């Protein structure tokens, strides 16, 4: 009987942690899908950052309908539902509790807690950095976020444009090698060649000292 005690303790702890219901998760993705489509789908964001030496860097990321599934952590139970179909089911509020399971490691609930705050035009991102491999099971490359929520990006097909592949809870500074400050974020639709819309501007930036890379020298900086 004694040898069962530790096992029983762990089991009750896990069940206590898993407090979110499928109904609650559906409510979250149903509210996030329209925001994702309105603010991010078929658009690109350009992050302008400065490192601790005041060097200026730029990172462009692109969003598709099919990326939404990765952000939820849902495990689909039906092979007939692909990533694009999943988004449409969420957008139309037709996804059911029978269509998915939560990830066994608790990441689905974690992603549900932070997803709403990331569905903004600028992802609510204040910092950007290279992933520091701090979570062994997590594969991502670049991370943009804040002190409470982050989004991870990888190169599409291993090369080319960066696309989102996960969302994370917690302080970005614990997840990246060095957290560069985002001083401005621009947004454009995929059909546009250049960026013109500014969706985030940091405070206390000496804009007259900012020198952009040649590729983005056309950008109009904030004043």
Residue ranges and their predicted role:
Residues 136-142, 149-154:
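Catalytic micro-motifs at enzyme active sites that drive phosphoryl/nucleotidyl and oxygen chemistry
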């Amino acid at each position: 009987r004694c040898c069962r005690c530790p096992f029983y303790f762990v089991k009750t702890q896990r069940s206590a942690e898993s407090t979110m219901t499928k109904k609650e998760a559906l409510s979250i993705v149903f509210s996030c899908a329209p925001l994702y489509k309105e603010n991010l789908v078929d658009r690109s964001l350009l992050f302008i950052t400065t490192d601790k030496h005041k060097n200026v860097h730029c990172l462009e990321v692109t969003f598709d309908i099919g990326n939404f599934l990765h952000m939820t952590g849902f495990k689909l139970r039906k092979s007939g539902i692909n990533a694009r179909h999943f988004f449409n089911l969420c957008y139309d509020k037709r996804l059911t509790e029978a269509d998915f399971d939560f990830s066994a490691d608790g990441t689905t609930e974690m992603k549900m807690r932070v997803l709403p705050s990331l569905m903004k035009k600028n992802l609510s991102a204040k910092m950007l950095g290279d992933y520091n491999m701090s979570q062994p099971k997590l594969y991502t490359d670049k991370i943009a976020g804040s002190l409470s929520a982050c989004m991870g990006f990888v190169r599409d097909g291993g090369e080319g444009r960066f696309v989102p592949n996960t969302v994370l809870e917690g302080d970005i500074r614990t997840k990246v090698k060095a957290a560069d400050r985002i001083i401005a974020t621009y947004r454009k639709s995929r059909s546009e060649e250049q960026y013109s819309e500014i969706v985030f501007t940091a405070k206390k930036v000496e804009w007259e000292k900012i020198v952009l890379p040649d590729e983005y020298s056309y950008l109009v900086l904030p004043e």
